[in-house]
From Swiss-Prot:
SUPFAM superfamilies documented for this protein: Ferredoxin reductase-like, C-terminal NADP-linked domain (SSF52343), Riboflavin synthase domain-like (SSF63380)
An annotated Gene Ontology molecular function: cytochrome-b5 reductase activity, acting on NAD(P)H
Name by which UniProt lists this protein: NADH-cytochrome b5 reductase 2
TM region(s), chain numbering: 41-61
Keywords (A to Z) from UniProt: FAD, Flavoprotein, Membrane, Mitochondrion, Mitochondrion outer membrane, NAD, Oxidoreductase, Transmembrane, Transmembrane helix
Pfam families (UniProt xref): FAD_binding_6, NAD_binding_1
Top-rank lineage group of the source organism: Eukaryota
Binding residue positions for FAD: 200-235
Annotated ranges, domain FAD-binding FR-type: 92-197
Catalytic activity: 2 Fe(III)-[cytochrome b5] + NADH = 2 Fe(II)-[cytochrome b5] + NAD(+) + H(+)
Length: 343
């Protein structure tokens, strides 16, 4: 019998062509550089920001000098025949990347494409990892730092894409939405998250809310682009309205291609009248129905979303490096801390 429990299918069944395109200050450590090439990724996507924060841009001669220094810093360490990686971690420091393209995705979300220092460079990110953005508001004493998960292909050369939702009062997301092509942003990485390898678990479940789909999509894409990876995936994705569902065409395409291994369940707080999916919030009854049972061996539940959702489902993290106590619905359903990972 299939591991996937029958439930209301998503309304997003029509496949669309996949495009190759498109607080307080916290301390984040980047991962040291590793050898080898990045994995080949076939499906394109946009990238969703994890949270909002403030902004500052560089212009004029200072920007040019900063960009030249970034290129020199990265390229002088490259050996012949090695794939160039923009983000190598360790003591690399910040790269000043130029905004190349801006695309309006919906009423509060934009896709931003930043150029890497060289056209034949890949980002250097792996699954699952993120980047850290920085800006210093005018007259502010401290810079604002915020992590984002690019889900442009890890093998894409010359650019990274961020899909950024604008949050009211969020200085970084507000600044990023105000940026124009040609302006620059300080970025570094990679920020290591959950190290994925093919068939690490037999079945994973991804519980996401809003822009929390970002690291989930990074995992999904890596799994289904690898013919050797047979992992089964269940996605539960909550949003306010249908318009807020990001990456819906990409997700529907994967589900249509792999119906026995990938199932997506969408939950809308304010659904349209014709909505055939789940309504309200992600709740205990839904998760009990569609998630793999906690008694099953070799499963993992990933959670990412706004603080209120995290508190209800799993409890929030204490810090970027501290998963915190497992609470909420997942604990009530009998999952152990080892079976749950909070992005």
């Amino acid at each position: 019998m299939s591991l996937f429990v029958a439930s209301t299918r998503s309304a997003f069944r029509a496949a669309a062509p996949i495009k190759r395109s498109f607080q307080t200050r916290r301390s984040y450590a980047t991962e040291p550089s590793k050898g080898g090439s990045s994995s080949t990724i076939l499906l394109g996507a946009a990238a969703v920001g994890l949270a909002g924060a403030g902004a500052y841009f560089f212009s004029g001669a200072g920007a040019a000098k900063k960009a030249e220094a970034s290129v020199k810093q990265v390229t002088e360490k490259i050996t012949p025949g090695e794939i160039k990686k923009a983000f190598v971690g360790g003591d690399q420091g910040w790269l000043s990347l130029k905004l190349e393209e801006v695309e309006l995705v919906n009423h509060n979300t934009k896709r931003l494409r930043f150029r890497l220092p060289e056209d034949d460079m890949v980002s250097g990110l792996h699954v699952a990892s993120a980047i850290l953005t920085k800006f210093k508001p005018i007259d502010a004493e401290k810079a604002v730092l915020r992590p984002y998960t690019p889900i442009s292909d890890e093998s894409a050369q010359g650019y990274i894409d961020l899909l950024v939702k604008k949050y009211e009062g969020g200085p970084m997301s507000t600044y990023l939405h105000d940026m124009a092509p040609g302006q620059r942003l300080d970025i570094k990485g990679p920020l290591p998250k959950y190290p994925w390898e093919a068939n690490k678990h037999k079945h994973i479940a991804l519980v996401a809310g809003g822009t929390g789909i970002t690291p989930m999509y990074q995992l999904i894409r890596a799994i289904f682009n690898n013919p050797d990876d047979k992992t089964k995936v269940t996605l539960v994705f909550g949003n306010v309205s249908e318009e807020d569902v990001l990456l819906k065409h990409e997700l529907a395409t994967i589900e249509n291609h792999y119906p026995q291994r990938f199932r997506a369940f969408y939950v809308l707080d304010n659904p349209p009248k014709e909505w055939a999916g789940n309504k309200g919030y992600i709740n205990k009854d839904l998760l009990k129905t569609v998630l793999p049972e906690p008694k099953n061996e070799d499963i993992k539940i990933f959670v990412c979303g706004p603080p209120g959702m995290m508190n209800s489902i799993s409890g929030n993290k204490k810090s970027p490096r501290d998963q915190g106590e497992l609470t909420g619905i997942l604990k009530e359903l009998g999952y152990s801390p080892d079976q749950v990972y909070k992005f």
